[in-house]
Amino acid sequence: STRYSRKTLPKQYSLHDAVFNISRSSMLAGVFLSKRWNLLKIAAEDKIHQDKRMALLPALFAVRKEALKRGALMSVLSGSGSTFLNICYRDDSSKLASSLSKKFGEFRVLELEFDNTGFNIE
């Protein structure tokens, strides 16, 4: 749960780690605007929460390693850890999903398309 996961996080962070994460989140926005997908892995680096929360479910470290090895452009923990997001080229998605499903059968793997319109009210 989010509440339990938050307990693994420190109450304070170093200025270095905070600046690192702010720079990466800014870079991530730039990557999506410029479509420089080769920079996604760097833009997804984190020093604030991912590794601390992933320690609650250590298999996620192997998931991230395998996903990046199998073609993911970025592999990140989303939120408190109920979701792990891997972004890859469309041509690699089935192969990546299949590989992760076979190797990590205890997890549910969903292969989804990007939604470039988001939420709309008509």
State what each model feature region is.
Residues 1-31, 40:
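Anionic-ligand binding region
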